[in-house]
Amino acid sequence: MITTREDLVRYAKGMELLGEIVSWNCSNISISQTALEEALKAADLSTHVTPELPFQTAFNRACKNLGQKHLIRKLEEDSEFLYFQFTREAREGEYFTYETEGKLTLSKETGKIACTVPELGQAVQEELDKELPLRKGADVSKLLLKLLEHEAGLFPVRPQGGCYLVMKEHSAFLDSLESFTGRVGGCLLRYPIPSGTRSGDQSVKLTIASALSALINEYSNSIDNFGSDTKPSTLEKAADHIRVARFKVESYSAYLEDERSKLDDLLVAASERLKEKVSAIAAGV
């Protein structure tokens, strides 16, 4: 019987884990791209998952830095440029008034700004140049998700995201991820799930099954949209998706128990649907 904290510690040290619930807090992070890559290297993680910050994302942050006095609306875009209208909002007596300030053009290739009001364009360009080399909490969160998806195969614990199940086989990878998150000013939260508890085993099974079911259904729904204009490469990719899903089901079969047969049925249905589509396209139907 566990009656003291020491008993609990001894029990925890000897228990076998199913996996961990993982979440993180990156809200106050602001770090350069160079420092981010150095932190990845120091934690023995890949630096190939850190794409450049899109100009429009940096532009949105730059505009936010200008304060609330400007209303900014995208007018249009083409292959080379994005066009925005800046409107000044001011309170006069009982009402707000709005005055068009100018039209701003952002180059998708260079990030350079042109504006019908030069001083406004210069102010935005200065803020944009400050934001481009920085990576914020949202960028690091996306990076953590990409690393987890690529290395560990995470499963959402709740539909809204933000909390994920990572199996015990990837605990060493989580150690590296925890090290990286701390180096950049964030915090990785890890909650171990012991094996052998009814609620824990059941929750792990249903979490994995739900994620795999959603994945297979997503592939099936995309197959339903195939038609005569569908490229052969798209059909091949759909077949690859089904093969990957089948491999994942097999890989996690030890945790799935009775849920395995339901997922197998979904895979069979998706495969049959793809065969029907391929035959129909070949026949010109």
Regions found by a protein language model. Give the residues of each.
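Basic, amphipathic alpha-helix used for nucleic-acid engagement in HTH/winged-helix/SANT-Myb modules
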Residues: 104-123, 201, 205, 224-225
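C-terminal accessory extensions appended to soluble enzyme cores
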Residues: 120, 213-285
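Low-complexity, serine/threonine/proline-enriched polar segments
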Residues: 51-115
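Extended, non-catalytic structural segments that build the interaction scaffolds
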Residues: 121-136
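Terminal interaction module
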Residues: 30-50, 57-64, 134-138, 142, ...
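Short, flexible turn/loop "capping" segments at secondary-structure junctions
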Residues: 14-16, 156-157
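Replication-associated primase and helicase/ATPase modules
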Residues: 1-2, 22, 145, 250-253, ...
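Active-site helix-to-loop segments that bind/position phosphate- or nucleotide-bearing substrates
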Residues: 2-11, 18-70, 110-124
